[in-house]
Amino acid sequence: MTSHQPRRSESVVSFAEARDLVSKHRSPLLVLSRSKLAQSYRTIRDHLPGVGIYYAAKANAHALVLETLQSLGASIDVCSIKEMQGAFDAGFIPSQMIHTHPCKTESNLSTCYENGVRWFVFDNEFELDKFVTFAPESNLLLRVSMTSRSSALNLSSKFGASPNQSLAMLSAARRKGLRPHGLSFHIGSQCLDPSDFGHALRSMRGLINEAIAAGIPLEVLDIGGGFPAPYRDQELMPMADYLDIVHACLTETFGDLPIRLIAEPGRAVCAESITLISSIVGKSFREGTRWYFLDDGLYGAFSGKRPGHTDYQLLVERQGQLDQERFDCVIAGPTCDSGDVLYRDFPLPEMEIGELVLAPTMGAYSLASACEFNGMAIPQMIAID
């Protein structure tokens, strides 16, 4: 039965569990709930019937995540040799893969092709010349530029052929002896309004009709991802309800056309399954303002704040104590970079060094973009179930 409760950012561990885990593994620590990951994947699969689900490895390519999804029968979207190798290590096979990077190095393309990957994406004629030389028997999807009013991040500002170029690009592929099989688009990251898919799908149907009329039969449509996850102070509709609207748009637009549909969700699959456990390692008063320094910051798991415009929820154990006075505080990361500041004017009660801070919904675009700046270790990840 579908729940109609709003989705909120919730931790996969309690503070008692977090303390126990930190005593064994130290912090910062990313904690994966495999059962939550499986639940998210199954919700997407079950509410997009007839749509092939290719998990976007770029969101989180950790072995624990990939192995769990492979065991559930997922397929996978890769963009590089390393992502392909990680997929192989997790048990995926080439027929379960699609390579969706529109701009590939010759090494990236040829190595993935030589290892059996056959589905690729392109968005310009120069990219087609690489396929002629290095991957001539590939099955190609043309990436088309599409945007959404409610997406947090426009993913068509860098990639995607304009719709009015689509027929010319498909024709160019045919002239070069290549095999264009369909279209792809990405509506943008963290798309909050599922009805935005309706406009994009109607546009894609028009392009497919145009191609068919020109003698280029297209048999695949990749609708990308963009399905959202709940972050700080957000209440989103249940994912099942969101996907039901997307599926209704698909049925309305393509119900009369025999076409293979696929999607590439990343954030919606993995975000809510992981919580970061961090510790306060420093405290100071600067011009009357409380500063708290965590053992993880913008160069670690919080790196997702930069590319995804993501505002993570922070939970402290004292938050539930109604008699606690709260202060507008600065929350900073551990590095020497003065820009490594997570929040300003963040309301917190008086905190002490050693106390834990939980950051839920940390599964997507966090570990994936972390680095060891200043020699600070990237948070390790463990699974709790």
Question: Residues of each region from the PLM?
Answer:
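Short acidic, glycine/serine/threonine-rich loops at helix termini
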Residues: L66, D89, L109-E114, F131-F134, ...
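Conserved, mostly hydrophobic/aromatic
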Residues: L37, K58, S80, C112, ...
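Active-site loop/helix belt of alpha/beta enzymes
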Residues: M146-K283, L348, N374
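Flexible loop/turn segments at secondary-structure boundaries
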Residues: A61-L64, G86, R149-S150, S189-D193, ...
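A charged N-terminal "starter" segment
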Residues: M1-S138, R175, R179, A213, ...
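Charged (often Lys/Glu-rich) extended helix/loop segments that serve as interaction or gating elements
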Residues: I245, L257-D385
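Active-site-proximal loop/turn and secondary-structure-junction residues that shape catalytic pockets
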Residues: K36, A59-A61, K82, C103-K104, ...
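Structural preference for beta-strand elements that scaffold enzyme active sites
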Residues: G52-Y54, G73-S75, P94-I98, W119, ...
